[in-house]
Regions:
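Cleavable N-terminal export/targeting peptides
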Residues: 1-37, 274-281
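Short glycine/proline- and aromatic-enriched beta-strand/turn motifs that initiate or cap beta-hairpins
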Residues: 24-87, 281
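Outer-envelope beta-barrel architecture signal
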Residues: 34-43, 80-88, 125-133, 173-179, ...
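Transmembrane beta-strands of outer-membrane beta-barrel pores
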Residues: 47-53, 92-98, 135-143, 168, ...
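Residues that define the transmembrane beta-barrel architecture of outer-membrane proteins
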Residues: 61-70, 105-113, 127, 152-162, ...
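Residues on the lipid-exposed face of transmembrane beta-strands in outer-membrane beta-barrel proteins
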Residues: 67-77, 111-119, 133, 160-168, ...
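Outer-membrane beta-barrel transmembrane domain signature
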Residues: 149-236
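Predominantly the C-terminal beta-signal and adjacent terminal strand-loop region
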Residues: 176, 182-184, 192-194, 214, ...
């Protein structure tokens, strides 16, 4: 049966209106799915200044340059009504330092991985605060080029950190900008440290390993990591500038190996959407 020509435009209009009405009902559900599956990833490279002072190797302070790379992933979860966000942050740095007498050098390296959750507290539509906890894993070394008996010092420690963030989405003359400040404070953990004057040969070959793993907290490991980032679009890409202030301090087994770093970093940000892996039975 053929429809009269005047009715065809009416039917098309009704179908379009129904389609629009159906789409208008989707955002509430679709937005929930997007928030829990939208992953923000950033890779950055940076350079800065570092101070290394390890009394196990030398009583002198060494200063120099720090090269650093980082990889971060953040996404919202469905836990606690979608208020919990998951963060994974990995960074590795390599330092080359020299003493004040200008007659000796050291190489230092440290890999750090943070993984944990933050609860989101929206203050306004553009500003929110986050608070949570992170697992904090660290491993590295300091190598003194002139020492012969004990040329290197290992660094290995695990912490439970308290962490906080402030994220602000703003516009400067219609140009979008996202600012973030994050601070991580180690609350408690365990650290490997030889006794002062004890060689690694005694620990691993002779078995004199008593007391080389110690409990740490604010009283003997007052450390702090702070990071300030700025995300902004450049064409179709999104860039990130970051400043990291990394202060690692401890006083365990009469050894003090503090290190302080100020690093400027730059990189790119990607936003990915995780799809469900549907398997056919």
């Amino acid at each position: 049966m053929k429809l009269p020509k005047p009715i065809i435009p009416v039917i098309c209009t009704v179908l379009l209106l129904c389609s629009s009405a159906m789409q208008a009902q989707l955002p509430a559900t679709a937005e929930g799915l997007e928030q829990s599956r939208l992953v923000t990833r950033a890779t950055m490279y940076g350079v800065g200044l570092t101070n290394v002072f390890d009394t196990y190797l030398s009583p002198q302070e060494y200063t120099g340059i720090d090269f650093r790379v980082s990889r971060e992933s953040m996404r919202m979860t469905r836990w606690m009504d979608g208020r919990l966000s998951l963060q994974s942050f990995f960074q590795a740095d390599l330092g080359y330092t020299r003493n004040k007498a200008d007659n000796n050098n050291t190489f230092s390296a440290l890999a750090n991985w943070n993984y944990g959750l933050h609860y989101n507290f929206p203050i306004t539509d553009n500003f929110k605060l986050l608070a949570g906890g992170l697992a904090d894993l660290n491993g590295g070394f300091v190598y003194n080029l002139r020492n012969t008996n004990n040329p290197a010092s290992a660094r290995a420690y695990i912490n439970l950190d308290v962490s906080g963030m402030a994220i602000w989405n703003l516009r400067i003359k219609n140009y979008p900008l996202t600012l973030r400040y994050q601070v991580n404070l180690p609350l408690m953990g365990v650290m490997f440290s030889p006794h002062y004057g004890q060689s690694y040969y005694e620990i691993f070959s002779l078995g004199n390993s008593s007391g080389v793993v110690k409990f740490t907290s604010l009283h003997n490991q007052p450390s702090l990591r702070q990071m300030l980032t700025a995300d902004f679009p450049v064409g179709r890409a999104k860039m990130r500038f970051a400043y990291i202030w990394d202060a690692q301090q401890s006083h365990v087994n009469d050894i003090k190996p503090p290190s302080y770093s100020h690093v400027l970093m730059v990189g790119f940000v990607k936003e990915l959407y995780l799809l469900k892996n549907k398997r056919k039975k």
